[in-house]
Amino acid sequence: MSRHVFLTGPPGVGKTTLIQKAIEVLQSSGLPVDGFYTQEVRQEGKRIGFDVVTLSGAQGPLSRVGSQPLPGKPECRVGQYVVNLDSFEQLALPVLRNAGSSCGPKHRVCIIDEIGKMELFSQPFIQAVRQMLSTPGIIVVGTIPVPKGKPLALVEEIRKRRDVKVFNVTRDNRNSLLPDIVAVVQSSRT
């Protein structure tokens, strides 16, 4: 039986929007929900990067176009974007660790949007995700990229897990998937 839910699909198809709708429904049903999502940062109509936003409202840069890496830090780049690993880890890791450690008798949902190339530069993040997927009582709802080019080890590991249900989000189905996503999470509580 599936315990965790992951959405996949091309960029811009609506994965994060679906995650945000699922958060609202799950919170209103009384389930504790924590985690983070990524959002585009635009300037004068152009995408200049991505921010990490925690569900408690903290926000910081994940990546920016053409920015310089911090002195003494290795450059982590995905295409035109330079990843700010320090900022990402300062925001995402405490949220994941908190969600995992505050697991009592009740189930908790941990939102991880997304597990992609930028985020996977962080070894502590990879370890935290694996920990979350293995912790009883934690239900992970996340996003993973469509397979393209060189496989991402953690993403492939997630796809192959028997306790993971992967929904492929398309423009045709994105407005009808929410009840299915919520149903998998709700059935994980029993």
Swiss-Prot record:
Keywords: Acetylation, ATP-binding, Hydrolase, Nucleotide-binding. Its EC number is 3.6.1.15. GO terms for molecular function: ATP binding; ATP hydrolysis activity; CTPase activity; GTPase activity; ribonucleoside triphosphate phosphatase activity. ATP binds at residues 9-16, 109-116. It comes from the Eukaryota. The modification N6-acetyllysine is found at residue 165. InterPro entries: AAA+_ATPase, Nuc-triphosphatase_THEP1, P-loop_NTPase. It is an enzyme of class 3 (hydrolase). CDD domains: RecA-like_Thep1. It catalyses: a ribonucleoside 5'-triphosphate + H2O = a ribonucleoside 5'-diphosphate + phosphate + H(+); 5-methyl-UTP + H2O = 5-methyl-UDP + phosphate + H(+); CTP + H2O = CDP + phosphate + H(+); ATP + H2O = ADP + phosphate + H(+). Pfam families: NTPase_1 (PF03266). PANTHER family: CANCER-RELATED NUCLEOSIDE-TRIPHOSPHATASE (PTHR43146:SF1). Has nucleotide phosphatase activity towards ATP, GTP, CTP, TTP and UTP. Hydrolyzes nucleoside diphosphates with lower efficiency. Belongs to the THEP1 NTPase family. Monomer. This is Cancer-related nucleoside-triphosphatase homolog. It comes from Mus musculus (Mouse).
